[in-house]
Amino acid sequence: MDQNGASGSHPNRLSQGRGAHARERGATVSAAANRSNIIDEMAKICEADRQTFAIARRTRGHERLAVDNSDFVAVEDLILSYAEPTPEDQVEMIMSDFCSSPTYAEDEDEPSHESEPWFRFRNKRIRTYSRKRDPKSHKAVQNEKRRGSSGLSVQRDLNTSFTSMACDFDASSQKIHEVLLNLSQYFSATATASGPTPVPSQIDLPTEARQDSGDECFNAELENLRDDLLQSGFTFEASFYENEHEQEGPGTMADTIYGDSMQSVPTTRLRLESGKRNVWSDADSTLKKADVEIAENKKLLMGQTQAKNVDIEENTNFILEGIPLSEWLTPMELPEISKDVIKHIPDKKLKLEPSSQKEQKSSKDSNASKVRGASKQSCDINTKNEGTTILDQPNAAEQENLLNDGELLEEFLFNDWQPMQCSNGPSTSKNAIQGPKENINSINLDDKEQPEKQTPNKSQTISSHQLNGIRKKSFKFIEVSEEMKIKGEEFVDKVVSGLYHFSHKCNLRTEEYSDNHSQVMESTQCAEFKSAPSKPIEILDGKETYNAIAKVDVGEINGKFSPLNNDTIAEPEFCGFRTASNKAIPISEKMKIKTAEFMAEFQSKETIQQNDYLVHQPNDKPTSVGLDTALKRSIESSEEMRSKASKLVVVDTTMREPHQPTLDPVCRDLNESQFFGFRTASNKAIEITEAMEKRGAMFLAQSKATDQLNGWQPSDFPDVLPTSPNNEIHSINVENNKAVNTKTVSETEFFGFRTASNKGIVISENTKIKVAQFMSEFQAADASTDSNQPTVISEESRNIDAKFVDEAAAEDSANKPTFCNVQSLKNTSDIEHFKHDFFVEHSAKEEHPLCSQPLVRTPRRSQEIHSSLSQLAGKSPLDQATKKSVIARRNLLSLKRKRKIILSTETSTSCALPTMERFAPKPSSTSTPLADRDLNRSKDCTKNRQDAEDMSPICMQPKKSRRLGLSRSRY
């Protein structure tokens, strides 16, 4: 049984092993299949990722128009979107924004002594305004005081970087910061340790300007300029200061934004060439105090005293101290030796010697010229004091060569010349100078006896003392011709003799000056005049120049000094006018005759205008008066005009004597040519015919009659006008100083009104009837007012009144009756009836009790009232004239409406007194036309009101709300 069990168990084991192997194999196959599926999926994912990345690269830079179908996001996009910036990137961005320049490249060889950061202003110094640097020994004490200062101080944070300080403080904020620090330091210094900070009564701030800001001329600019000068090849001398840092003084340094201090530049000014020196004006130095400190430092360091000579150079602490940089950019000329300014000029005496003596000593061969300028004199200068002289030359030989006329006069300053008067030329001064005539004559004789000398060429030396002719400032000779020499001699003789002749009269006044000026007169001669740039002026020959100068000098001398002798200068008789150049205008006899005729005619015309005198002249055109026109054209005058002018003068004299009734026989001849009429602007007579005379008489008569008719009252008209059957009336007699009876003028009978142009207004029969009815009603109203009794008006009169009101309203429109002659009035009975009904008797007006009281009635002239209220839209409601017209128009419209209501009623009791209501006074009202305020209609209107829903918002009535305060509703 064991064998069977053993043999039976072996196939079972095989089957089990096969099953296990099959299961393992299936697991491996399934695992391999799963691996292949994962690889395929990864491949698909990579392919999708590749495609999405390619699409993202193509669409990068612009917005995607459509959303992706899948929700897949590329890894690169995630990295770029979620990457955080590093501190290095932020620093690079800030440096590129603020410290980079597109046109600037950094140097590779960066200097080691400059502090970071590097930016485009590396080689430039920023101007800063800092306080004075205190000595190093007191820095710790001041820092302790700052920590305990008051709340007004603004402390600088020591932990902040220099770059932030540069960004925070500019020029203006630095100045404010500095002022606050000074105030804080002042309050902290005055505070006591025990008690609180006391409040001082006043703050003693420094009044002088800051030395470190103006006097240092901005150390940054100085250093830059120093570098530029060193590059250009300039060299500076060694400094007198050995220890620069130890000898730092307060107020000489300035802090930069990087904390490093600007070192002083221990250099001196450049030494100029020998014979030249720097001359600076007072404006070049900015602060006097700095100059004093520099001078003291130099004395301590050098140990030597300053020499008296001005040529010794001043050594300064800085180069270009006190001189702005802008002044060095412009070229500057060094001052010449001859133009140096000497502040203390010693007293000098000028001794003038004749040039003839000098000429004999220097050169015997040279001869004096005939024409010699005023500068042809040599001068010796003797000084009293031992001070500096204007010219200091070592050799006497060089001094003799250089002291010629031109250079000698150039070396003198303008203020060195003492005022001195010379009598060798025309003088414009008021002081008379007298010189001996013998000396003058001797001078002239000597000049004439001297031989002529040739004009020097340009090749001659300038240092020679002799000069023939006139010389410019640039040492160029001017040739003088023989004619000019002769004219000059004659002119000098005339002027000198004339001056001597006139100055002899003032001998007593000028005795003290005779000795000095006699010497000058002997050695000086006047050649000719010179202009401002020393150019010669040609002298006119003849006696005109001499006479003009003599007259000027005589006038000046006679104006100041009274002559001893009673000799008067005979002036020529003057008759006429003078021009602007003081030239006499000759007046001939012909001009005198024309002027006399013109004055006679002018006086006669003026007399005629004043006395209203008419001169009759013939119609033919007379000749003109002999005067000159504006174009200097002569106007011929005839004998007839002269005779008329003489007659007019006689008439003028006779008219001024009213007590002599008889006229001169010459005036009787004027009746030959009678003149009656007017004249034109050109003095032409206007002929007046007989027809014009008749028209004028008719016009005067008619105007007088019109004035009388306008002045009459209605009660002054007579009942019947005297008329003839042929409709002819007599004109009114017009009296003008005498009764003039004019002849009767046949005209049509006139009765009615006239316009402003004297045209008749037509009055029709219908108008007459209406006016008569109107006046009857008016009289009836006045009578009823007197008796206070009601009057009954018939139905016929009411209808007529209604028609009259309607027609009157129609007449208010723009259509007005036309104007024409009053020829339609033929029946005199109608005229009498119209006049009788139109005018009110004067006695009735006096008996009326209400006539004396001003009544407000409807205006009678309805055509002057505005036809509608729309015409008042553009006018102000506050205008009084507009307000009155509105009230009058409203009263007229209400009158018509009431008349229609009264006429439409059946009973006559309701309208018992229509005339009283019509002419009754109306109460005053405002200019705004209001609606009808009938109490009976208000109740009916409430029933017919529409609901608010049915009405439009425009037509809806405003809701009345209760108003508080002082406001009132208008209605």
From Swiss-Prot:
One of its GO terms (biological process) is meiotic recombination checkpoint signaling. Residues 349-364, 931-948 have a biased composition (Basic and acidic residues). Keywords: Cell cycle, Cell division, DNA damage, DNA repair, Meiosis, Mitosis, Nucleus, Repeat. This is Breast cancer type 2 susceptibility protein homolog. Changing E242K: In strain: Zimbabwe30. Disruption phenotype: Viable but female sterile. Females lay weakly ventralized eggs that fail to hatch. Induced sensitivity to DNA damage induced by irradiation or treatment with hydroxyurea/ Repair by homologous recombination is dramatically decreased. Instead, large flanking deletions are formed, and repair by the non-conservative single-strand annealing pathway predominates. When combined with disruption of Hus1 females do not lay eggs and have reduced size ovaries with apoptotic egg chambers. Involved in and required for double-strand break repair by meiotic and mitotic homologous recombination. During meiosis, has a dual role in the repair of meiotic double-stranded breaks and the efficient activation of the meiotic recombination checkpoint. BRCA2 repeats lie at residues 570-604, 671-705, 746-780. It is found in: Nucleus. Residues 1-30, 130-155, 349-395, 420-466, 916-971 are annotated as: Disordered. It comes from the Eukaryota. It comes from Drosophila melanogaster. GO terms for cellular component: nucleus. Interacts with Rad9. Interacts with spn-A/Rad51. Interacts with cyclin CycG. Residues 130-139, 959-971 have a biased composition (Basic residues). Residues 1-15, 375-392, 420-432, 453-466 have a biased composition (Polar residues).
